[in-house]
Curated annotation (Swiss-Prot):
Positions of the UniProt region annotated as Disordered: 1-23, 88-140, 158-182, 201-225, 237-280, 338-366
Organism the protein comes from: Mus musculus
Biased amino acid composition, Basic and acidic residues: 90-100, 347-358
Self-association and partners: Component of the Pol II(G) complex, which contains the RNA polymerase II (Pol II) core complex subunits and POLR2M isoform 1. Pol II(G) appears to be an abundant form of Pol II.
Annotated positions of the Phosphoserine modification: S268
Protein name (Swiss-Prot/TrEMBL): DNA-directed RNA polymerase II subunit GRINL1A
Length: 366
């Protein structure tokens, strides 16, 4: 038997039934986009025959899906009715089971009178406690669930109160036809019960919560608790918080509490030496850096004449210094050396000195 090489096998037929309608529409949109591209279709060997075939298959599958969905929509109310009936039958079965269990409890309680009295008391207490809670939470429950609970609760209580012998005789006679009639009647009156459950409460009438509290005077005796913010305000009024101090530069924390500004107003103004001492002490407190000692006297006040004389003297000294510096720079450029000039030399001087000595000796001899 001839077999194609690996990688050249024909593709397996696609199963369009497994894909959803959204996937089929997406594939159809892509294939139609390819068909609109004429340049791409011309380059294909089959001129887009396969693409057109897939488009036809996809359209047929989509139309078939739409027909099936339209038929299913016709039977949708019937299916909903069946579901409601199934739910009603299951609830009826549960009611029957509860009745049987209640019969067993009644039989056991008839054997033990002490236990029966205890059970009756406990049931009364639970019913009393469940009463106000049912009133408070009645508005939050859905109307449909409330209808079912209302319909089922009286039947359960009636069956519990009936003796076990009567219930055992009644259960076999309960036929399926009666259950179906009850289910159909409950389904027909479902909408009516929903409307009947809706109530509009007037503002003039007291609310259910108020009636529940009136039935229980113990709850009214309790004092209403104060809100938390009222407690905080009362506590703050008793113990006021002092206002925070404003931040000031170069002020120690010890001085902030003493309020130095008020103390200085009451005292007499201190002398200059005392102020200097305080300033030095303040600098020593806030920093370890200290000023260097002064080499000159502090600034003094001078008259206008003295200041003019000092300025002229300073200007003259400055000009002389500038002249010396200019002459020194000029001599360095011209390579001139300033030395003592003596054209006669040392001998002339010596001769004069000797001659002077001889003249002095001759004068002495005379």
């Amino acid at each position: 038997m001839f077999s194609l090489p690996r990688g050249f096998e024909p593709p397996a037929p696609e199963d369009l039934g497994r894909q959803s309608s959204a996937e089929l529409r997406e594939r159809l949109r892509r294939q139609e986009r390819l068909l609109r591209n004429e340049k791409f279709i011309c380059k294909l060997p089959d001129k887009g025959k396969k693409i057109s075939d897939t488009v036809a298959k996809l359209k047929a599958a989509i139309s078939e899906r739409e027909e099936v969905r339209g038929r299913s929509e016709l039977f949708h109310p019937v299916s909903v009715d069946c579901k409601l009936r199934q739910k009603a039958t299951t609830r009826a079965d549960t009611d029957v089971d509860k009745a049987q269990s209640s019969d067993l409890m009644l039989d056991t309680s008839s054997l033990d009178p002490d236990c029966s009295s205890i059970d009756i008391k406990s049931s009364k207490s639970t019913s009393e406690t469940q009463g106000p809670t049912h009133l408070t939470h009645r508005g939050n429950e859905e109307t449909l669930e409330a209808g079912y609970t209302v319909n089922s609760s009286p039947a359960a209580h009636i069956r519990a109160r009936a003796p076990s012998s009567e219930v055992k005789e009644h259960l076999p006679q309960h036929s399926v036809s009666s259950q179906e009639e009850e289910i159909s009647s409950s389904i027909d009156s479902l909408f009516i019960t929903k409307l009947q459950k809706i109530t509009i409460a007037d503002q003039s009438e007291p609310s259910e919560e108020n009636t529940s509290t009136e039935n229980f005077p113990e709850l009214q005796s309790e004092t209403p608790k104060k809100p938390h913010y009222m407690k905080v305000l009362e506590m703050r009024a008793r113990n006021p918080v002092p206002p925070p101090h404003k931040f000031k530069t170069n002020v120690l924390p010890t001085q902030q509490s003493d309020s130095p500004s008020h103390c200085q107003r009451g005292q007499s103004p201190a002398s200059s030496e005392e102020q200097r001492r305080r300033a030095r002490q303040h600098l020593d407190d806030i920093t370890a850096a200290r000023l260097l000692p002064l080499h000159h006297l502090p600034a003094q006040l001078l008259s206008i004449e003295e200041s003019l004389a000092l300025q002229r003297e300073q200007k003259q000294n400055y000009e002389e210094m500038q002249a010396k510096l200019a002459a020194q720079k000029l001599a360095e450029r011209l390579n001139i050396k300033m030395q003592s000039y003596n054209p006669e030399g040392e001998s002339s001087g010596r001769y004069r000195e000797v001659r002077d000595e001889a003249d002095a000796q001759s004068s002495d001899e005379c």
